[in-house]
A protein has these predicted regions:
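Conserved tyrosine-mediated DNA breakage-rejoining catalytic core shared by Y-recombinases
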Residues: 30-36, 51, 78, 86-128, ...
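Active-site/catalytic core of tyrosine-dependent DNA strand-transfer enzymes
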Residues: 46-53, 114-162, 172, 195
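Short, charged phosphate-coordinating catalytic segments
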Residues: 20-27, 75-97, 184-188
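N-terminal DNA-binding recognition helix of tyrosine site-specific recombinases/integrases
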Residues: 1-33, 80-83
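C-terminal catalytic core of tyrosine-transesterase DNA break-rejoin enzymes
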Residues: 6, 73-84, 150, 157, ...
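Long, amphipathic, Lys/Arg-enriched alpha-helical "connector/arm" segment
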Residues: 1, 33-67, 77-80, 88, ...
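Hydrophobic (often cysteine-bearing) scaffold residues that line and stabilize catalytic clefts
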Residues: 7-14, 48, 67-68, 115, ...
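Catalytic-site neighborhood detector that most strongly recognizes the C-terminal catalytic loop/helix
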Residues: 37-38, 46, 100-107, 120, ...
Length: 214
């Protein structure tokens, strides 16, 4: 039809302008205070220091599956999402950096996870046992890695049912690190949360050294 292409071009230009304006000025910040707070109850997590110390102690002394125990310990150093943890492969480890491919991330973006000396030492120990396997946390499960329910089931057995979850490690880390006044952007980057507005589009500083210390 006559004029259809011109209408399409104008429409695309208008939509493009709207997106550019949002990215530059993040208009959502102006209305967030008028919205009701939403509190998720799906991911229980610990926040008190003594409770966290007890959790880490129980994981250290867990007598069940070696891979499961190591996965939970590694999670406490990296606080990544469940899938990247469970499906972690040796080929993703590059020295002091863990390169999580985009297809394993909820955000569909690759994630760089700087590894602390403790995390590297843990991987070195695991490699002596599972170094010949594809997956770091190898399992006899049909896919070769830990199932989604395995880690949660172990936490329940240790007495944390309804108190702390696998995803709760992320909430726990965020709460503790913010209380310790670590840089907010570094925390969000480590959690693979994309900063909104200008920061999300133009922020190229990954704060890797800072995140390693954090």
């Amino acid at each position: 039809r006559r004029g259809t292409k011109e209408v399409a071009k104008r429409t695309r230009a208008i939509i493009g302008s709207i997106f550019k304006y949002h990215m530059l000025y993040d208009v959502s910040e102006r209305v967030k205070d008028s919205l009701e707070d939403f509190t998720s109850e799906n991911h229980p997590h610990l926040t008190e220091k003594e409770d966290i110390k007890e959790l880490l102690h129980k994981v250290d002394n867990y007598k069940g599956s070696y891979e499961t125990r190591m996965a939970l310990k590694f999670l406490s150093y990296t606080f990544v999402r469940s899938r990247p943890l469970r499906e972690a492969e040796w080929t993703e480890i590059d020295g002091d950096m863990w390169r999580v491919p985009a297809h394993k991330e909820k955000t569909n973006r690759p994630l760089l996870v700087p590894l602390s000396t403790q995390a590297q030492a843990l991987l070195k120990e695991i490699k002596e046992i599972n170094g010949n396997k594809k997956y770091i946390f190898n399992s006899n499960y049909r896919d070769g890695f830990l199932s989604e329910s395995t880690l949660g089931r172990i936490l329940t057995r240790m007495g944390y049912g309804g108190k702390h979850s696998v995803h709760g490690y992320r909430h726990m880390a965020s709460t503790c690190l913010n209380e310790l006044e670590y840089d907010g952007d570094a925390i969000e980057l480590q959690l693979s949360h994309a900063p909104v507005g200008v920061r999300g589009v133009y922020n190229k500083a990954k704060k890797l050294n800072y995140r390693t210390k954090m």
